[in-house]
Each structure stands twice: as C-alpha cells, then as structure tokens.
C-alpha cells in the first residue's frame, strides 16, 4: 500500500523503530571495534533509506533528499567495503580491529574536503528541491552537513581510523537538529521522533566510541612499530 495513506503511518512507526534498534546495536559494536557492526549496519541503513524517502515526500516542510541518497547509494554499499577492510586489519567476530590515526596532512585534507563538500552539497540540494523558494534554508544546510560528514565518517570508519569518532559526534549533533526540525514541521511526526531519540543515543555512543578507539589506536600504533622493527 502507499506510504501516504493513513493506515501506513503505524507501519512506518514500527518500521523506523526496528531500524533504530538495529542502528543502536550497529553503533555499539562499532564503538567496540567488532566487525559484526556491518551486519547490523545493512539493516539500519536500508530502513533509514525508506524513512528518509517517506519523510521527503510528506506534504509540508523541507525534504531530506541528501539523507536518503546518503543511506541508499553510499552507506549501504560501504557496509560491504568496511567488512572487507576490517577483515584485512585482523577483525573477526571475536578479535577487535587494529585501529590507526590520521597524519597531520591527512587531517588537514579531511577538513578541507568537509568545508568545500558542504558548500557544494548545500547548493545541489537547494537546486534539487525544486519546490523550495529562493533564500537560506537551515534544514537543507543541516542536511548538507550531515551528508558530507557521513561520507567522511564512513570512509574513516571503513579504513579503521580513530578520528572517525570526531566526525560521528558532529554527525549526530546535526542529525538531532535535522530530525527535530522535521518533527516540528511535519503534520505526522510520530516516527521522526524515533529518529531524534535514535541519534541522541548515537551521540552518547560516539563519545564512548572516541574513548575506546583512542586506546585501540594507541595499541595499533605500538603493534605497527613492533612489526616494522621485526621486519
């Protein structure tokens, strides 16, 4: 049945809740360096894609097409890339991944990509939302920020860099604002509230993830130094 029909609203609430639960498991496993995070990630991003699509076609408010494209066409395939990369760095269902850190040059490049990417994404999303009048749109800016940060965060995560957690903290802060705005703008905001709760938990978990991965990256750095000395 069509998602716009009244009877579909309850289904979408349950559907979003299942995705939120999978996302919680996904982020907890990720924070602990467990490769099974990508299994639950597939479930999470698939459901999040449907939720973002449905939210974007709701009457009234600003669409979140960037969020939809991010999940459907980037996050989903990157789950498989991440699984492959983590396996290369020693992760399995029992062993944690060997984490690493960015060099100063790589960190500067990441910041530059973020700033330029956000500007480009904002104007592309404004153009794509043909029903939106000219002018500044805070929701679209948040959508662009979340889009670019998620792209960077997923790359850093797949390559097992500790700095991913700085990115995820920003992602979750902006996501809370994004979905809070959707909840206030939409006539039926039941499942958007679920998304606000979901990203609020993600924010707390990302802070814990930074703590854990800081230690994992120190251990990974020591192991790399030892391997170089042995070789």
Kindly label every feature range from the protein language model.
Residues 21-27, 45-50, 73-82, 147-152, ...:
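Alpha-helical transmembrane segments and their membrane-interface exit regions
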Residues 155-231:
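C-terminal transmembrane-bundle signature of multipass membrane proteins
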Residues 43-99:
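Hydrophobic, ordered structural segments
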Residues 26-40, 155-167:
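Membrane-helix interface "capping/anchor" motifs
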Residues 2-19, 67-76, 133-146:
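Structural signature of hydrophobic alpha-helical transmembrane segments
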Residues 70-86, 98-126, 142-153:
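Alpha-helical transmembrane segments of multi-pass integral membrane proteins
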Residues 50-66, 127-134, 183-193:
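Helix-coil boundary and interhelical linker segments in multi-pass alpha-helical membrane proteins
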């Amino acid at each position: 049945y069509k998602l716009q029909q009244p009877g579909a609203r309850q289904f979408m609430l349950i559907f979003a809740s299942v995705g939120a639960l999978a996302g919680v498991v996904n982020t907890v496993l990720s924070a602990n360096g467990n490769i099974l995070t990508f299994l639950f990630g597939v479930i999470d991003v698939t459901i999040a894609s449907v939720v973002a699509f449905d939210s974007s076609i709701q009457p009234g408010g600003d669409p979140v097409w960037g969020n939809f494209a991010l999940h459907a066409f980037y996050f989903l395939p990157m789950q498989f890339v991440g699984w492959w990369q983590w396996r290369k760095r020693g992760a399995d269902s029992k062993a944690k991944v060997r984490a690493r850190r960015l060099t100063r040059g790589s960190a500067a490049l990441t910041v530059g990509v973020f700033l330029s990417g956000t500007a480009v994404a904002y104007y592309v999303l404004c153009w794509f939302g043909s029903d939106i009048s000219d002018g500044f749109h805070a929701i679209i800016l948040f959508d662009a920020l979340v889009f670019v940060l998620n792209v960077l965060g997923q790359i850093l995560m797949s390559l097992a860099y500790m700095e991913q957690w700085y990115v995820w903290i920003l992602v979750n802060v902006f996501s809370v604002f994004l979905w809070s705005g959707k909840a206030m703008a939409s006539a039926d905001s039941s499942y958007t509230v679920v998304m606000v709760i979901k990203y609020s938990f993600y924010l707390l978990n990302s802070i814990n993830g930074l703590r854990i991965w800081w230690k994992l990256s120190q251990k990974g750095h020591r192991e790399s130094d030892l391997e170089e000395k042995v070789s």
